[in-house]
Amino acid sequence: MKRNFELIPTNGIKINTLIEGDGKPVIFVHGWPESWYSWRHQINPFKKAGYKVIIPDIRGYGRSEKPKNVNSYSLKEITNDLIGILDHLKEEEAHIIGHDWGAPISWYTSLLFPKRILSVSGLSVPFNPFNEIPPIKLLEQIYKNTFFYILYFQKIGFAEKELEKDIEKSLRLIYCNSDAFGMKKMIDLALKNNLNEKDKKSLFLEGMNEPKDLPSWLSNRDLKYF
């Protein structure tokens, strides 16, 4: 099915955005490592329910522009991107739904722009308010010498070198080890004390199981698209 996309200028960059349907807008915000395509199964049901579906590739993802400066990827910048999309479409307000890393984006869009957001829904990640300790410092205190992926991602160039070596394999490992079945396997191993703890010098994909087959929710065609 041919989808309707628009490259929308917003907040100084251009964001690839799927726009379909009529009615009150619903913005869907994807997580990592994903794109608008993660919400493909929600498009038609929401259109039939009478909503305008808006699904951007968040800056840095998919066909949206990718600023080189790391500071360009703050929650403040990304929330401004979304509000700019509403402005471009001449929409005063919208519902917003986020999954994974898209959930904090959704929470903070509603927090920073309460008059523009009708409702907010977060999947996978609960609301986490800022506190006196910066998030990275807090994670460093919690994990110390233990591997944690967000801390690993702070090392500029490390994750890129590992994950871009074979992008399709990286995505296959990530998707198949972080879905409900993959997480259950890790929890079961942890409960039996058979889960090897990674130290902070480990690589992201280290210890992930190579799947023999893709899960029912992910086809080879889907994987190729991502």
Predicted region positions:
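Short gly/ser/thr-rich secondary-structure transition/capping motifs
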Residues: I8-N11, E34, A103
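Generic alpha-helical hydrophobic packing signal
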Residues: R3, K14, I43, V53-I55, ...
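Alpha/beta-hydrolase fold catalytic core
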Residues: M1-V26, K48-Y51, E91-E92
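Conserved HGGG/HGGXW glycine-rich cap/lid loop of the alpha/beta-hydrolase fold
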Residues: L18-E65, H99
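A generic local structural motif
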Residues: G12-N16, W39-H41, G84, S106-Y108
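Flexible "cap/lid" subdomain of the alpha/beta-hydrolase fold that forms the substrate-access gate
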Residues: Y61-E65, N71-I97, W101-Y225
